[in-house]
């Protein structure tokens, strides 16, 4: 929670500076290559910037050898007409989230797109109209990474891309889709994703392993394709589990694969 609040404060400061600049008729972040976004759009999209950055950060950590990425696609689902949805700020934050974990440079709204191009990463966007409240600028954001291997096979969609999706709920970013599995976990702290056989006792087993090492579980969600078949367990943890804990999780017979993700 503390880390998320610190990040949100940093984003808030950056947005506030951009809003002040926009009110003066300046570009966002007062730089030529930063997203030029009107103040009213900045204000409306503020709750979504953390979601956008977190989804990008999660997606790149699912790649086996993240520096090999060449193509990413962002899908914005909204009740609004695509021409009425300004996504430049969200695109910049997603790009920042993808690039920062695999870059030695400091990444911000100004240099994110430039750094992505230097690394040969092409980012495309699609706006999809859905039946949702038009008062919300964005219903959900989906990030897809193409032509890469995944550390977590269950994050791969039917089309062969790494695919994750999220929403803002009550002002908090949530992960709602991993590959073809539906989940619902707050994107705060760190995250463990496990693919398992859907059977009783799995939550308790993993929780006990983490508890033995004094790792606090902040939330947990299970999504499955069918009863008693494969399921995805998403576990939020406040601390980073040590190697011993992660090894024990991998040794649970019903767990077929898992991945630890830093937020």
State what each model feature region is.
Residues 2-263:
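NAD(P)-dependent dehydrogenase/reductase Rossmann-like domain
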């Amino acid at each position: 929670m503390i880390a998320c609040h610190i990040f949100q404060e940093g984003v808030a400061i950056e947005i506030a500076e951009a809003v002040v600049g926009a009110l003066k008729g300046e570009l966002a972040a007062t730089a030529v290559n930063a997203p030029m976004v009107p103040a009213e759009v900045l204000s409306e999209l503020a709750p979504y910037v953390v979601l956008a950055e977190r989804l990008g950060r999660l997606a790149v950590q699912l790649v086996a050898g993240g520096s090999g990425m060449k193509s990413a696609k962002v899908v914005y689902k909204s009740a609004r007409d695509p021409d009425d949805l300004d996504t430049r700020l969200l695109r910049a934050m997603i790009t920042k989230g993808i690039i920062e974990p695999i870059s030695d440079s400091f990444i911000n709204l100004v240099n994110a797109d430039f750094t992505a191009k230097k690394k040969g990463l092409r980012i495309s966007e699609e706006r999809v109209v859905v039946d949702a409240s038009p008062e919300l600028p964005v219903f959900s954001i989906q990030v897809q990474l193409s032509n890469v291997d995944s550390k977590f096979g269950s994050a791969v969609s039917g089309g062969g891309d790494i695919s994750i999706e999220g929403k803002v709920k009550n002002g908090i970013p949530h992960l709602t889709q991993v590959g073809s599995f539906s989940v619902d976990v707050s994107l705060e702290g760190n995250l463990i994703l496990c693919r398992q056989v859907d059977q009783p006792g799995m939550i308790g087993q993993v929780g006990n392993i983490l508890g033995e090492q004094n790792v606090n579980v902040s939330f947990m969600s299970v999504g499955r394709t069918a009863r008693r078949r494969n399921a995805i367990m998403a576990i939020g943890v406040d601390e980073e589990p040590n190697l011993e804990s992660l090894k024990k999780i991998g040794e649970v017979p019903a767990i077929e694969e898992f991945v630890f993700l830093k937020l």
